[in-house]
Amino acid sequence: MDGGGRSLGARALLSLISAGPMSRGDLGERLGLSPATTTRTVRPLIEAGLIEEQPPVEVGGPGRPTSLLAFAPNSATVAGIKLTADRLYAVLTDPLGEVLIGDSLPLTETDAGSVAALIASVVAQLAERSGRRPDAIGISLGAAVVGRRTVVVASFLGWRDVPLAAMVSEATGLPCVAANDVRAFAHAEA
């Protein structure tokens, strides 16, 4: 399977993100799909709000105007949190990583419960100010993290075996992952 094992839907989304709006025919050609398979692939993405159909465009020759498919940048909002020894940095982004709003607060209390509560508070404040509730939260920090959930060791915060993602998820009601900051940066740049 080409596409690195990704589903057809994921490949379609990535194509629209990287190449911009295109017709169903162009998308199908790019992915090597028949017209019927292209339609079956994009229909659930349109229904989920991940892809939007743009108004028809005149093609300049015979035939019907062509509707373009485009990635819907407002389809999701993600909260990103960066913890340092003395500050908490928070942003809300669209799925492409475009920062919508951000804030930075001093980290005066470093026990895990206080930090989880501060994260929940700042995420709620950013959501209120932007009018966009995040769909998920990602936290990065200079620490050993396992399973994208548990901070094994964060010396600068005095933490050992802290289930940070679960704590923040419980405080916010949102899915949450945690990652080592260098790994998170490398993943974002990949």
Regions found by a protein language model. Give the residues of each.
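Extreme N-terminal segment that seeds HTH/winged-HTH DNA-binding domains in transcriptional regulators
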Residues: M1-R30
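Basic amphipathic alpha-helical segments that dock to polyanions
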Residues: L16, L27, T38-I51
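Short beta-strand(s) of the beta-wing in winged-helix/HTH DNA-binding folds
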Residues: S23, E52-E53, E58
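Canonical helix-turn-helix DNA-binding module
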Residues: L33-P44, G60-G63
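Conserved phosphate-binding catalytic cores of ATP/NTP-utilizing and phosphoryl-transfer enzymes
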Residues: P56, G60-A76, N180-A190
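Gly/Thr-rich phosphate-binding beta-strand-loop-beta motif of the actin/hexokinase/Hsp70
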Residues: G63-G102
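Glycine-rich phosphate-binding loop and adjoining helix at the ATP-binding site
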Residues: V99-S104, T108-A120, A124-A190
